[in-house]
């Protein structure tokens, strides 16, 4: 059994939340049933998917909530799903579960923004605690989603050369250094920088760094 139960059902305080939805994606039906039963036991709504494709087909209609995601699935890994959501500009807290103690994979998932990473077997109370943490973060992430989409659209409006110049700007290169790297004139670099700032709707390099930092997951 992948869930460790404890006497008195520790951590099962009922959550009176009618708006949030906990999405669960796992190719093992037994896992889906066990996790959905656990989540429903604290009064939360659940939506289950037996494949990554089925879940991604629902993207665009995601309610405020969180995603419990299996790492290893046949057609698409959990990390691939996480990456795809970032590309789509969808912001939802993710909790990963895995049948294998893969530390590098866990580190990669957390760095990409996951809330937590559990290796089976794990304690019910730990998962429920992670869900509570995720639900506290969910409203802000949901609110930020349209902004991420707009920023991504602005970035994609940059020409290939402007994206190259942007890369050097973010690395702290001076105009002269960027010109040498790209074999163009310093005046041309200045024109590209001006266009980048205009398209990204920022007025300073500091703001440019800030908005591209917000976009880093979507641009991987």
Swiss-Prot record:
SS bonds (residue pairs): none
Post-translational modification (record): Phosphorylated by TmoS.
SUPFAM superfamilies: C-terminal effector domain of the bipartite response regulators, CheY-like
Subcellular location: Cytoplasm
Segments of the chain annotated as binding DNA: 175-194
A single GO molecular function term of this UniProt record: DNA binding
CDD domains reported for this sequence: LuxR_C_like (cd06170), REC_FixJ (cd17537)
Protein name, UniProt field: Response regulator protein TmoT
Organism: Ectopseudomonas mendocina
Gene name of this polypeptide: tmoT
